Amino acid sequence: MTAYYQQVLEGTYDNHVLPFLWMKGESHKTIAEYLEKIAGADIHEVCLESRPHPDFCGEGWWRDLRFVIDECKQLGLKLWILDDAHFPTGFANGAAKEAVPELRKIVLTHRTFDIVGPTSAASIALANMLDKTERFYGVTFMQDGSPVDVAYRVFDDADGNPSRLVFDAPAGLTQACVIFTSGKTSYNEDYINMVDRASVAQLIDAVYEPHFEHLGDEFGKTILGFFSDEPGFANEKGTTGPDGISDTLIGKATAPLPWSAELERRLRAALGERYLAELPHLWDREPAGAHVRHVYMDIASTLYKECFCDQLGDWCRARGVQYIGHVIEDKDCHARLGVGAGHYFRAVGGQDMAGVDIVINQLVPGMDRGLHSYGRGVWDLEFYNYVLPKLGSSAAHLDPKKQGRCMAEVFGAFGWHEGLREMKWIADHFLVRGVNWFVPHAFSMAAFPDWDCPPHFYAHSQNPQFAHFGQLMSYMNRTASLLSGGRATTPVALLYHADAEWAGKANFMQHAASELLRAQVDFDIVPAEAFEDAGRYAVEIAADGSGFSVNGQAYRCLVMPGAEFVGGAVLDFAARAAAAGVAVYALDELPNKRYDGDTAGREGFASLDAAAVADIKLLATTELADTLANTGMQTVVCAEPQPWLRALRYERAGESYLMLVNEHPKQGISTQIALADGTPVAGARLDLLNGTEPAAFDGTLELAPYESCIVVLGATGSVAVATAEDEATCVDGPWAVAFSAPGTDAFGESVELADLHDLSSAEFPGKAGTFRYRASFVLGEAATRTVIDLGEVFETATVTLDGKSLGTRICPPYRFEAAALLAGEHALTIDIINTLDHAVPDVFGMTEPSEPSGLLGPVRVLG
């Protein structure tokens, strides 16, 4: 039987990309043109997004979708559908806006009043002239931060609504925390309530059911499923601090909180008689509120999962389709309220794939730490590099429903400076971190240029690099096919910081994550619920001390980011693991408090003594990678440190793959690698991007900037290609250069260049398109095997030698095999396509530099 990797090389692989196609009511002629372009780019699935469509879920929408379905059948395409009139999901096509109050979004708010006593018959007006939906819920009186019993009376107005609170304030300073429910929020007020099952059902009734009614005959056939885009609690938008982090953490003093009757019922049951007295701690970060904050977030995020994600996923699966999408993970919102969903693993729990999203230059090749300005704020690049993709791939590994599948929405809103070279870098970034499905963002059928979140693929033939877009899509399909259907090797379980952060001070995961991946130590992020929810997670500790598994995914140790608080289930696991000889590490500090248990329920938290954390080893974050490397946890061991090398080990159907990626855009990697046990890395090195023959690999790793490869361990390959030391001649010119604008094959008059330089700053300012270089060179003697090396290129290159095409390269290394060449003169033609930002400005590129244009060289013939 042919090995699977050989089948992939021979063209038998699965589709793993489903780009957005924005639907705004365009003509069927335009839609047909775009679907043909999509299918022609080795893409076999597409996700339709109303952006917005003028008649979403109306006759115009159904007419357009029937046309799309007919076209897709002819082209061999399958469909996904974004599940609302516009993003973010939750508008329910306007249904929530017209719904009765109990089906609309509800939040819990408070106002604090200071009363200097003793004061008899102190009075507080309960009416809010700015919010007619606000209703009195309850009051807690406090002195010196502790609840006190104060009798009070509530007087109603003529309509029967509470209007005034009257009480006798005791001596001293008394704070009255008056709590209200409200239907008014500052963000997406007309959206469904994510913690209310009946409210979420409005989305099903308004969008999902009409699609089934009109197109149900195509469910599970042409229509594969639905896509939720960036749903969240939407209790507020929140603000972002100078560190690039959202402020929507539970305990924020001014935050309205998600609320529903079911949330109230569960919260009352969990808190018992202390219920009302504990609620004020939802708006502070004091240790005494750790228990109630954790209980609230635990309930709210669980209800989000049950009411929203599970309900939609169950509806889809019952009708033969799948449910996918992503929430907002940015700015550490994945563990917070606001635009977030509180707990990433629960937020995507009902989906058939995990999902994440990268946008607006949140990745910058060569910059993996620090803050990057994007014009309206800053991004914490350590999070986007080392945590964001791993959230998704970890959920895919841990949830059996997902079968190892994780989707990433990629390329969107970077700006026109993002070309195929950076897109390939982004694709590798996700692939080597375990992501194996992609939603490229986006095909826009609006008139060019469309200012809505470029770049756009094809763009009515005005995106010149679209000519080679299919090469990137084929590469992503091939690589993702190899990295699907098996299991990644992730020896480290990194504890998800959400629970600890809800309770008190906690370090983010990204500091530990960056130390691990920069040392080629792979990991999954594992939530605390894995150690407490036996219904969803099966945890087994190996009796021989070799490690433990969660739902079949094997780990050798647990690493806890530094935190003040920990839960009892994690402590219990640490004790059992230590007894079996499995290491549990805490970074930089040991937890000293519990947020759960009987004592925490009474006092707000429970202090931990040394015995309680004796099974946890304290370790500095800066020592983490070396400690784990010394115990054999590296995916590969390099002869010297390689902080820009990323490595993934993947086992599939008896085959073992190593994906190796150089993530530095300027520096090459040259090293010797071995497996952690000292075994030499030997096998066949695959070039899935350019389709060259598999090369024999003996552990000597050479990767140019932007370059990646997959090594099939134990397989055989051909001889290595020519190296830079084999130079035969240098092509010095002169060069004749002509320009062709996008959408045309015609070239203008040539200009002569004495040397190679940036064309945008000299002969062709403000131009984006194809630059055709012509030159000749003389080979002094015949060569049996030659390679053309173009040096620096911006940014795609197609080479023709003596009238024969040598192919296209969309990123470094720009090397082309030319086989045997006779002595004498040879004609060289090189077509270079730059990026559209040189001709079309956009707001997303206002904080991003422009690359040069053209061929910078040096151009060498190797052989």
Residue locations for each model-derived region?
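Carbohydrate-binding surfaces of carbohydrate-active enzymes
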Residues: 7, 13-22, 27-33, 45-51, ...
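Exposed low-complexity, polar/acidic, P/S/T/G-rich flexible segments that act as propeptides
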Residues: 840-863
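A glycine-anchored, Pro-Gly-centered beta-turn/N-cap motif
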Residues: 817, 822-824
